C-alpha cells in the first residue's frame, strides 16, 4: 500500500491532518534503528494486518529491526483494534477490560503506537529524542507539524512524540482497519447466506 496523502494535504486549515500524517508514519521504516522496519512490517495490510514473515522462531514471535533479535510476542492484527475501549477496571463485572493486547500492555491505540519504536527488540530506537530527530529530518513531517504548531514545538520531545502516537492511532481508525467484510458481515447485510452449521 502506498500513501495517498500529498505533502499539501498534511495540514488542513488550522488543524493537523492526523489521519493523513498517520498513514505516512505507519509505512515509514525510518522510525526503526536500521531503517528496515515500519509499523506495516508487522501489521501488513496485505495479510489482514498481521506479521506473515517467516523467521527462525517459526512465527511464534515477530522479528524486530535487528534480525538477530525477536520481539516478545507475535504481532496481533490491527484490524478492529479501534473498537477496544481504553484499559480500565469495570466495576459492574469486577474485572479489567479493554486496552490493546490481552495483558493490557497499552491502554489505547495511541499508547500502543508509541511502544514499538523504542522497544529494543522491536523497532529498536534508543529513545524518544532519537525518533523526534528523524521526524524533524523528514520534510513531510517537519513542514506539516511546523505549519500548525510552529518551530518551537520541536524543542519539546514529548509533545512531538505524542503527535506521532496520535497520528498513527487516528490512521488505525480508518475504515481500512474495519471493513466488516466476512461472510457473517455480508449475511447481516443480506448479501450472503449462512449454512445451517454457520448459523448455529
Regions found by a protein language model. Give the residues of each.
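Periplasmic c-type cytochrome electron-transfer domains
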Residues: 1-200
